[in-house]
Design a protein with these regions (language model features):
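Short, acidic (Asp/Glu-rich) active-site segment that either coordinates a divalent metal cofactor
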Residues: 167-173, 181-182
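Nucleotide/phosphate-binding catalytic cleft detector across ATP-hydrolyzing
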Residues: 1-159, 176-191, 203, 211-310
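Conserved active-site beta-strand-loop modules that form the wall/rim of enzyme catalytic pockets
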Residues: 156-160, 165-170
Length: 310
């Protein structure tokens, strides 16, 4: 077995993210082998198709096996992409919102680590045996921003991590999180997409998929009717304005300091957050893998004796 491989995983409500991949959190279980091996995880004698749709809301992601199975799929994807051995020792780096970090750290680490024994499974028809030798947990959002040191020169800056279900807020003072400023708002992109879907259904009688709506938000031309596209962007603009108002109401003055927006929602809302002239100074980090990259970077710093995050 080779040296320990560090793999960062961002366990989102809507999507799982690693340094090189992002895939939906949907998980469909089958008793028998599906017709295709694409995105199929075989574990414990059962088959799971990974990435079909999204998970129902789980406020505690450790209450079911779903996110553990999604973690195995994420590890397999990274090992294959990196050309690493499929029998590997893993240092898993993950994150939690700062608002619940102290409360949930122990249970999350136990959930991912288990007993540290070898885990045999198959992914997309290939055999894997991984041993999770260590789990390190870090504050999400903060870990992502640390990858962008040039953005941290301001004495105070707001960080808004727009996820699927929540928007996690914090203020950094001289690069250090101000714990009293941390908030978690249930205003994530799932709500935005659902509101858009309902408005399109009401005006046009159409049931659009999440994939269609997200494609339009990214600016894809496609073959969509321009009237529908206009409604999508109008609703997204309303959502962005409401989000900025909620940030201000939570005690973070977006008129007084820069605001860094990151996460999957920031990538989708880039044009709308950038268009809020006079409301804030937005800095958009649209790389959805920034948290995962930040986790791996922090593990590297730990190994050199800089900081800690267990």
């Amino acid at each position: 077995m080779n040296d320990v491989i560090v793999i960062g995983v961002d366990h989102g409500y809507a999507a799982m993210k690693t340094v090189h991949f992002s895939f939906p959190t949907g998980l469909v279980e089958y008793e028998h082998e599906p017709y295709t091996q694409k995105d199929v995880l075989e574990y414990g004698g059962r088959y799971y198709v990974v990435g079909s749709g999204r998970q129902p809301l789980q406020r505690d992601k450790t209450q079911t096996e779903d996110y553990y199975l999604l973690t195995l799929a994420a590890i397999a994807k990274e090992l294959e992409h990196r050309g690493a051995e499929h029998t590997a020792s893993i240092h898993l780096a993950a994150g939690l919102p700062l608002t619940s970090f102290g409360r949930d750290k122990k249970s999350c680490r136990s959930y991912l680590y288990r007993d540290g024994s070898a885990i045999p499974f198959r992914y997309e028809g290939q055999d894997y045996t991984v041993t999770i030798q260590e789990v390190s947990l870090f504050p999400q959002g903060y870990a992502a921003v640390l990858t962008q040191t040039e953005l941290l020169d301001e004495p105070s800056v707001i960080v808004a991590d727009i996820g699927g279900w929540t928007v996690d807020l914090m203020r950094l003072d001289n690069r250090i999180p101000n714990a009293a400023s941390c908030r978690s708002l249930e205003l994530g992109m799932i709500r935005c997409v659902d509101e858009i879907s309902e408005q399109v259904r009401r005006l046009f009688g159409l049931s659009m998929t999440t994939a269609q709506i997200e494609s339009a938000l990214r600016g894809s031309s496609g073959g969509m009717d321009e009237r529908i596209r206009a409604v999508i962007h109008t609703q997204a603009g309303k959502y962005a304005r409401n989000l900025l108002s909620a940030v201000t109401e939570s005690g973070l003055d977006i008129r007084a300091m820069p605001a860094i927006f990151l996460g999957g929602g920031a990538a989708l809302l880039k044009r709308h957050l950038s268009a809020t002239d006079g409301l804030c100074r937005p800095l958009i980090l649209d790389d959805v893998s920034l948290n995962a990259k930040g986790y791996e970077r922090l593990v590297g710093q730990m190994s050199r004796g800089v900081g800690n995050g267990r």
